[in-house]
Amino acid sequence: MAIILGADAHGNELKEVLKSFLQQEGFDVTDVTDIDKDFIDNTLAVAQAVNDKDTNLGIMVDAYGAGPFMVATKLKGMIAAEVSDERSAYMTRGHNNARMITLGARIVGEELAKNIAKAFVVGSYDGGRHQIRVDMLNKMA
């Protein structure tokens, strides 16, 4: 499993914190950020890299998280969530099989962002009754 990270200029500093943290935690991290590009291009880079391999997960950071969430969910097969707390990050993996989260650097601080990232990447999809929802989401895009 690789954790694919991306950011725009507003999220790059927090993304670097997350990259260092996740590497220290022993995760394989790939940073696809092109700091000269908009959040749309960087979000697409993360989402496409996540979709390249079933086990990949993605985290995209900009100022507020909303824009990247909208971009990511336009891609076929991508289930993403905009999160600002640990529980939502963990639950969106377990119940929604989200493979990507978006964060806002102006919303969450460094420690919260680290907790969110860890909750997301250690979570696992529960399957079962949740698969009906996942199938419905995947039919939409």
From Swiss-Prot:
The keyword Flavoprotein does not apply. Its EC number is 5.3.1.26. Keywords: Isomerase, Lactose metabolism. It comes from the Bacteria. It catalyses: aldehydo-D-galactose 6-phosphate = keto-D-tagatose 6-phosphate. The keyword Isomerase applies. InterPro entries: LacA (IPR004783), RpiB_LacA_LacB (IPR003500), RpiB_LacA_LacB_sf (IPR036569). NCBIfam families: lacA, PRK08621.1, PRK12613.1, rpiB_lacA_lacB. Belongs to the LacAB/RpiB family. This is Galactose-6-phosphate isomerase subunit LacA. It comes from Streptococcus equi subsp. zooepidemicus (strain MGCS10565). The gene is lacA.
